[in-house]
């Protein structure tokens, strides 16, 4: 792992479609390993990606025929790509900040212990001013 720099990266994951979650988490991990201070925010339906049970139900390409979904998942498995659970653990262990939207937590009636390890609730009073605005890049998935 590269030593962290002063560059900050803000990643927002707003969808619960597996490919988008995967791309957001892989981007976050790549930036973290390149030395950026990474914060990943899970809002809207993206909050499902950090729920202990719902993360297991994420679908790849849900708008495509089932055979296409199966082919893509098989290719990902053949490439030995990590699943979101593994990526979240890597990000947490490597020092990224993982935040869930407190509004969506209430809307979807999640309990505090529903989240995977390492996820905290974002502070609405400071999230944008302390995380988003100072970031060198803000990416949304």
Predicted feature descriptions by range:
Residues 8, 132-136:
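Polar low-complexity intrinsically disordered regions
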Residues 10-21:
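Short, glycine-rich nucleotide/cofactor-binding loops
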Residues 38-44, 99-102:
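Short internal beta-strands
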Residues 46-59:
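N-terminal beta-loop-helix "entrance" segment that forms/cooperates
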Residues 59-93:
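A glycine-rich helix N-cap at a beta->alpha junction
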């Amino acid at each position: 792992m590269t030593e962290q720099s002063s560059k900050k990266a803000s990643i927002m994951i707003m969808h619960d479609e597996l490919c988008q979650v995967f791309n957001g988490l892989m981007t976050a991990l790549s930036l973290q390993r390149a030395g950026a201070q990474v914060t990943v925010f899970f809002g809207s339906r993206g909050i499902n990606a950090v729920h202990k049970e719902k993360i297991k139900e994420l679908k790849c390409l849900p708008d495509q025929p089932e055979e296409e979904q199966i082919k893509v998942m098989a290719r990902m498995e053949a490439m030995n790509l990590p699943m979101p659970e593994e990526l979240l653990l890597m990000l947490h262990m490597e020092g990224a900040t993982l935040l869930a939207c407190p509004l969506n937590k209430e809307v979807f009636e999640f309990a505090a212990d529903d989240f995977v390890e390492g996820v905290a609730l974002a502070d609405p009073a400071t999230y944008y001013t302390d995380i988003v605005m100072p970031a060198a890049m803000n990416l949304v998935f």
